[in-house]
Amino acid sequence: MAGGRVLRRIGDPVVAGAPVGVRIRTRIHPTAAESEALSAIGNLLGSVYRGELAGRVGLRPLDRQAHGLWRAQRKQALTAVSSSRWAGAITRTVEDQYQLGMRSVAAHIAELRAAIEVLEARCVLRPGELAPVDGDQDSNSRGRSRRRRRGYGSAAERFTKTRRLAALRQRLTSAQEALAAGRPSITVGGKRLWRNRNHLENTDMTEQQWRKKWDAARMFLTADGESGRTGGNETIRVDEAGRLRIKTPAGLVDRFGSHLVITAPVAFSHRSSEWAARVNARAAVRYDISYDPARGRWYLDASWKSSPEPTPALDELRGGPVLGVDLNADHLAACVLDASGNPIGEPTTIAVQTAGLKASHRDGRVRAAISRLLDLAGQQNCAAIVVENLDFADARATGRETLGRGRGGNAGFGAPSPAFPPAGSGPGSLVWRRVVGSR
């Protein structure tokens, strides 16, 4: 207790493990004819994928036995229009997308309930009225401090909030029905791009530009890796010389032959030696081909599972110096700390200016800041980077209802929290292991 208030509970620190996968990207430089063939293959497989996804949503949740039977039947049916390997990738991706949709509905329900709880607590009060003092009001289930709730500033604001509360309740009912029925709402190509079609006047796209983006986002050019096969993938293969070969679906063999070979060789820059070692060892490598219509560029992504080193124990990391990091809206404040938590040397400020930038630019700025943190940790021989888990995911669920209006109320949303995902259920310290050379 401090002045009658319950302080925020500090959670136990956890060590974030190293990533268990690798993904690298390079450009493809196809000719006009090869680009046309890639588009035709992607559009055909995309159409098949969307049809299978719609059918899978209609089946609702399946147990293990029923799912195995469904996938075997669909793979056999799809082989006639694609190939056995394309059919395997499509059915696997369909199931992954369905499960992701179900998890998204469950997460959406949790966010709606949190927002409704906040609105209900304030809407029951008259404008300007203070909630009565109650022991249950001092702290919530997450252990955070809670002030006495106050009613909204005016009757007009309260009326607006009651309308929003009714809308959220309606959305919650719809989401709960979708979850119970096992029918998530999935938009292949992205709901944001779909909404842009209905509001083109508010975007910088013409209808033709939107159509190109929409068609590109709905293509399917994903091939799962196969261990023991040449190059680690028989569907999309890249050999040691960089020659890219794509297996043509059965429905397009008459036009493009059994395989489409890209004339210009491809080359990976980042982690190229690891990729080459897997190709030579015939280890599984997954490939994804995508198209950016705004730039007119084709991209090839290679991904595979990695074998990270065991996560070190927390006591082991505490033995040496660590780099403590404080997250702020426009910068990261870092300082080297000894084993007792005392600062060593001068603190460092790393600017992270993301206001007004596109999502891709914001992501680049945050990645650059993380790279500087890793470099600083390496220069100071720090065993780990320690950053507080501020639990911004929970704040975003109820922030519109609790943080108030204007720039002051929304200042907390400027912190680059997506780059520092929470690893625990409650606020606390998140310890990141420093990996030399990782970016």
Give the predicted meaning of each segment.
Residues 1-439:
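Nucleic-acid substrate recognition interfaces
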